[in-house]
Amino acid sequence: MDKIISFPHIGNYHVPIECLLKFIFTDCTVQAAPPITKKTLELGSKYSPDFVCAPFKYNLGNFIEALDEGANILLQAGGGCRYRYYGEVQEQILKDLGYNFEFIQIFSGNINLVTLYKTCRKYGSRLAFHQFIYYILLIIRMIRIMDKIESNIREKIGFEVKENSFENLHKKFLKELKTAKNFHSLNAINRKYRRQFGQLKINKPENCLKVGLVGELYSLMEPFSSFFIEKELAKNKIVVSRYTTLSYLLFEKSFKDRKFLKEAKKYLKFHIGADGTTSVAKSLMLARQGYDGVIHLKPFGCTPEVNAMPMLQNITKDYKMPILYFSFDSQTSETGIKTRLEAFYDMIIMRKEKIL
């Protein structure tokens, strides 16, 4: 039987992940799960425990869709919260549904290159270790390039002169990114699109509204799970800042938690788990930088982010900066989200006008 490897979606990171797996598993078929839709959430919710978090349901729905398209090896990555324990539950649910597959789990706090290389060899990789390291470094570079360009898009897309100019160029960028085979071609793509994005015309006022996004990583990085909240903000000509990216999670977070505790010592005495500490520290940073507001995103029942909320309320009190809280689950209404966003937008406009 041919090996078909698949993995769940999170933002646009299926592009570098798919590239990496194709480099490593040359004798296997690699395909990302189908793009997330309402059907994905419906499937995941149908077979998940009722009170499990939304990312679990999205991933389970992705796995079911991938298996239905022929995948027989599934890849799952765990994080710093209880989600790291969900892999076993998802595997058992899928096997109870009658699917036959192999399940590979990777935990972010327990990754080393030698173990990862041995795991890849076990599942059919023929790369020598130095080749494996080369492709890992190539994909790390790809992720950093992608995150930097997308951060630039978030800051400017709300002020584009020609409608959809940023989005259309972004799609071309992601498509061409898949063609990169080495550092030379990857850096050429980076230079090309940095230049092209820089040439897009924008009409950005001097005192534009600035809003930061903080919260749980999946709700921040997977736009479908938050009803494309970044696009909604951009429609109202708001600069959007989001610091939680794959680059940050992989290469910065573990080194910065102690620094964050020190910077936010008035509000935090201890690390509160997963992304909670980051949410508090980044909200404090945004308040000090004069941002007009912060939006806090989390799945329903996310313990670390629930722990962070009292500290965020204290930051609001001390800095007079409004924070809007959203919790997402399979029953969340898009209409309700948009209504609350409109009210938040009206409030920060009035606050801005009063200050100016």
Report each predicted region and the residues it spans.
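An N-terminal assembly and electron-transfer interface module characteristic of large anaerobic redox
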Residues: 1-356
